[in-house]
Amino acid sequence: MINLLTKTLLFLIVTIGLAFPSQTSCGYCYKKVDGRYIIFETKTYHQSCYQTYIQVKCSHCSKKIDGHYSIYNDKSYHAGCYKKYVQIRCDHCGNTISDAYNIDNDKKYHKACYVNNILEKCDACLNPIEGKYNKDYWGNIYHQKHNDEFPSCDNCNRLMCERITKGGYTIDKKRNICSLCYPKIIVKQSQIINIDKEVKSVLSDIGINNIPSNIPISIVNSMAELDHISTIRLGNVRGYTHYNVNTLAGRKIKEEFHIYVLSNLHELAFKAVLAHEYLHVYLFQNDYDLESDLREGFCNLGSQLILKKDNSIVSNYLLDSMYESDDLDYGKGFIKMNKMLEKKGWNKLLNYLVKLSK
């Protein structure tokens, strides 16, 4: 916010002389002027009337003012009194302010002091930020224009620039991975072994114990490949469970599962996706045919379980992304199922799934 300091300098014009024939009355008492008189701002006064009633007095020291003086907020001051006691001072450098200034949180600053020392600095370019700006989950702030200059990481949504993430890389010209997430990404089958054990252990704690141990888990390199494998349009989904069942006389004789998860996911995101897919397996095993919003919402409860257990800033970011999603299935459906979970708990919710089934 910018205010303009109004500093007015007026010259007190005082002429002292002898009365002349055409002068008839004092501008204050209206009596005839004889002898010495004073002219101030085109009016003539008895010398005593002027000194007693008209002459300007300093609002700080109360002494009479002769010559130049300053007016501020309708009060008059000696130039020295004004500068020393009244004139606004910068809350950063302490020097007086004589022209335009900035107000921030009721403090006043020289424009240069404000821009160079008070304004937030952009984490992408280090220049001061004036006006609107973006702030990410991690506390980084940056000019809005940088959204068009740098990509955002697909895992953490940080701006991929040198000062925020030390850059990153792009996969297939579509997916972006920042250098901060890179050490934690999953790209090899060997990385899955311990993750698989951990996810199954977490699910076992809530009563889901019958997940087959031999389900293959494949890492898929691109969204296009994941779409092709699923044969359905997945949008921004990061995993898919293929299910094949053989029956005889209406009874299951063989079930086959294959889980596909997108590559280059942060380890926590990979765990969350795998937990989601394992709950799909649970639904298939029990023949629970839920509406799509309830189905995906229920499976997202598995992701939530993993992320809450971790309770790191990365997991909290992923959780908040789930809570804020406006997707009808993965967002609103998840919120709906989460309310059921909060009301019933895991044991009752698992038993209640049969009633939710079509």
Question: What function would you assign to each model-found segment?
Answer:
Residues 1-21:
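Classical Sec-dependent N-terminal signal peptides that target proteins to the secretory pathway
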Residues 119, 147-158, 208, 324-358:
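Pan-zinc metallopeptidase signature
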Residues 203, 272-286, 296-300, 304:
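Active-site recognition of the HExxH zinc-binding catalytic motif
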Residues 232-271, 278-285:
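Active-site scaffold of zinc-dependent metalloenzymes
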Residues 288-329:
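Post-HExxH zinc-binding segment in Zn-dependent metallohydrolases
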